[in-house]
């Protein structure tokens, strides 16, 4: 479900497992998917990892079945609410979009307030990331941050979460997301979705987001529509992988560099941009790459104030 690297991180993950047969610690989700393909005798994409796990190795001896990598294509997973936009013509670009439920059952214990967020990988390198989980009980303030809307690549209204956080594993007034349209082609495709989490405000706010991957022109367009009647503070958040270098070029343009990629982000002219580097004094600018393991990274806040319906476009281009 993504070209190169681990399976994208969404919601909680604590690196837990029941039995270790002595192999290296690899992505458990990728391992489980690979195992399911063996049992179901599906010859498909080997997900997430290049190395074969010990579990796969032994199962393959008995099942006489091997998994081979194949070219990814854009795909919809409507039951979960995840949608993959994949360019198959030139650059390997994977964009995973989230418009699924907040979480399981009415408490959504392991859910994060990340409706309409997305993660981006180009040529096997993570560019825009989900921050991960980091902690469950030891550091409640960090637990709250990593679950929050501001910690994800989506829009925050009036510094409030999309859903109402009632505890470390408890949510109330769940934001409901819905896919409005889904179109794909060999260059990527386009998805439009909305969520109703901010309709609970005294002046209800509806957030609709369209994301289009145009691989032929090496461009991603993100269009955020905010429907309201009174004044609101709008923050678009973007979080970059810790291996990326992020710099402001001018008042509305960012340059992101990784080992193999040079990427430009063009934000709305009317927005105020603030880059935050992770430190002991801020929650923003942190990425959890394992349970109880966090590293400093760069986060962007793109801030605007509106008092009527508004639309904002962000462009992501690479070379």
Where do the model's predicted regions map?
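Carbohydrate-active enzyme catalytic cores, enriched for enzymes
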Residues: 1-128, 182-185
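CBM-like, beta-strand-rich accessory domains located in the C-terminal region of large
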Residues: 11-58, 133-134, 138-319
């Amino acid at each position: 479900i993504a070209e190169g690297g681990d399976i994208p991180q969404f919601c909680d993950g604590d690196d837990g497992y029941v039995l270790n047969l002595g192999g290296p610690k690899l992505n458990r989700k990728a391992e489980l998917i690979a195992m399911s393909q063996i049992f179901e005798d599906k010859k498909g994409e080997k997900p997430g990892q290049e190395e074969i796990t010990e579990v796969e190795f032994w199962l393959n001896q008995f099942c006489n079945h091997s998994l081979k990598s194949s070219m990814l294509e854009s795909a919809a997973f409507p039951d979960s609410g995840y949608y993959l936009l994949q360019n198959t013509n030139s650059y390997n670009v994977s964009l995973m979009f989230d418009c699924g439920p907040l979480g399981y059952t009415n408490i959504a214990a392991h859910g994060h307030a990340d409706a309409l967020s997305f993660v981006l990988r180009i040529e096997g390198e993570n560019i825009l990331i989900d921050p991960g989980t980091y902690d469950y009980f030891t550091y409640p303030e960090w637990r709250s941050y990593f679950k929050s809307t501001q910690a994800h690549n989506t829009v925050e209204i009036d510094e409030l979460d999309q859903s109402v956080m009632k505890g470390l594993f408890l949510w109330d007034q769940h934001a409901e997301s819905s896919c409005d349209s889904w179109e794909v082609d060999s260059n990527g495709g386009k998805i439009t979705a909305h969520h109703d989490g901010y309709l609970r405000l005294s002046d209800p706010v509806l957030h609709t987001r369209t994301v289009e991957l145009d691989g032929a022109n090496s461009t991603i367009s993100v269009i955020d529509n905010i429907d309201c009647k009174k004044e609101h503070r709008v923050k678009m958040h973007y979080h970059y992988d810790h291996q990326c270098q992020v710099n402001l070029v001018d008042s509305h343009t960012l340059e992101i560099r990784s080992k193999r990629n040079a990427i430009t982000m063009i934000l709305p002219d009317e927005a105020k941009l603030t880059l935050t580097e992770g430190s002991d004094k801020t929650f923003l600018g942190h990425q959890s790459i394992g349970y109880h393991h966090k590293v400093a990274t760069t986060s962007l806040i793109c801030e605007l104030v509106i008092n009527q319906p508004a639309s904002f476009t962000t462009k992501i281009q690479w070379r």
